[in-house]
Amino acid sequence: LVGGKFRSEIRAYASQLQSGWAANRGKCREPQEDGEAALKAREEGYDCVKYDFFSYAPDGREYHGEDYNRILSPATLRMLEARTAAVREAMGPDGDIIVESHARPNANAAIQIGQALEKYGIYYYEEPNTPTPKMTKYISEHVNIPLASGERIVTRWQYAPYFENNSLRVIQ
């Protein structure tokens, strides 16, 4: 924006694939559907996708606060892992996956989700919970995935504590 042209291309990612992709728009309820949406995006040339794996339950209902504002059950974690594994398979080892949480989980659930998904080589974990400097630092100390935020942090003064405590790796 200031200082002249720096690059001729920028990278874009396919976003919110939990709602399907292209002609396959609709709620992804099963891991196979998540994988198919990622594969469609990959075929269109995207090498990075962003998902909220905690949007739609297998029965089609939307998840709500009571589903992710608590310690998550082993069955829930297996479901999140199965969905992530399907997307990882579709994207291949070199494709990037961004996990989106819309700041909904509490800290316990955010940590559980992050730890369960670490093995899938997640590019970054966006808004794992409602951001506060201390809570974001706490989550960053328990999850080995770069954390991102920005939809709820908007000024340089609001970002300062996150830079000072080194809890965010990506700002948006």
Task: Describe the role of every protein-language-model region.
Residues 1:
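Metal- or metallocofactor-binding catalytic centers and their adjacent structured scaffolds
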Residues 6, 53-54, 138, 163:
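Phenylalanine-focused residue identity feature
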Residues 5, 19, 154:
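Residue-level detector of flexible, active-site-proximal loop/helix-junction positions
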Residues 126-127, 149-151:
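Thr-Gly-centered strand-to-loop micro-motif
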Residues 45, 115-123, 140-148, 163-171:
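Glycine-enriched alpha-helix->loop->beta-strand junction motifs that scaffold or abut catalytic
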Residues 107-115, 154-166:
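Catalytic cores of alpha/beta
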Residues 5-12, 90-100, 140-150:
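Short beta-strand/loop segments at the ligand-binding rim of alpha/beta enzyme cores
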Residues 14-133, 137:
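Metal-dependent enolase-superfamily TIM-barrel catalytic cores that perform enediolate-based chemistry
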